[in-house]
Amino acid sequence: MMIEIPGVFSPAEAAQLVERLRAAQWIDGRATAGAQSRRVKENRQLDGDDPLAREIGDEIIRRLAQNAVFMSAALPKRIYPPLFNRYAGGESFGYHVDNAVRGIRASRERVRTDLSATLFLNDPASYDGGELVVRDTYGEHHAKLAAGSMILYPGSSVHKVEPVTRGERLASFFWVESLVREDAQRSLLLDMDVAIQRLTQRDADGESLLQLTGAYHNLLRMWADA
């Protein structure tokens, strides 16, 4: 399941983040890749310990905590500190799979990568290529979103970033450990939550809405790894 979360930041806010990031010290992205990914990875990244990466990463996490779509879709338990990458001049990242568990360098904490997230930071019209391509049993799914919008998809997915042939692509990427580790279960809970919100807005029958809300929370109680 791929979920688009529009407007995490406004285009103007995203443009300000881009200006701050352009002045940063970028390193070869292969420095943070595993043996398999290193063969297909060609981009630049900010070091995870870079003060600017931490500062903007904290801003992203605060913004996500206020985003109802993200909270409902991800049911986050832990969020890996956001990282940042930059593609230009034909750079790309071939098909790969993210590590199942990632350790946070600043602590002994580990994050299970149930969900992967990419937050697009610059205007898609400002660069050619750079699509995120996620492959599953139904084929390939392409994402190249507006500045400030984010795509959320299962961390188990095979995915790649197409070559950027004009301009540059700046993005933040990170992983989410969910209270509910199974994608199918999260999808069902999201569908139920959306239905509950729509029925609430329509002032639906109170008893039926109460039953559906109870079923949602009982399933969450059954499946949550809290």
Swiss-Prot record:
Give the range the annotation lists for the signal sequence.
none
Which controlled-vocabulary keywords does the entry list?
A: Dioxygenase, Iron, Metal-binding, Oxidoreductase, Vitamin C
GO biological process assignments = DNA damage response; intracellular iron ion homeostasis
Q: Which InterPro entries match?
A: Oxoglu/Fe-dep_dioxygenase_dom, PKHD_C, PKHD_hydroxylase, Pro_4_hyd_alph, Pro_4_hyd_alph_FE2OG_OXY
Tell me yes or no: is Oxidoreductase among this UniProt entry's keywords: yes
Residues covered by the Fe2OG dioxygenase domain: 78-178
Cofactor list: Fe(2+); L-ascorbate
Question: What EC number(s) is this enzyme filed under?
Answer: 1.14.11.-
**CC cofactor note:** Binds 1 Fe(2+) ion per subunit.
User: Which of this chain's residues are annotated to bind 2-oxoglutarate?
Assistant: 169
Q: Where does Fe cation bind?
A: 96, 98, 159
Which molecular function GO terms apply here?
A: 2-oxoglutarate-dependent dioxygenase activity; iron ion binding; L-ascorbic acid binding
- NCBIfam families the UniProt entry points to: PRK05467.1-3, PRK05467.1-4
Protein name as catalogued: PKHD-type hydroxylase Bcep18194_C7101
Question: Which organism is this protein's natural source?
Answer: Burkholderia lata (strain ATCC 17760 / DSM 23089 / LMG 22485 / NCIMB 9086 / R18194 / 383)
User: What taxonomic ancestry is recorded?
Assistant: Bacteria, Pseudomonadati, Pseudomonadota, Betaproteobacteria, Burkholderiales
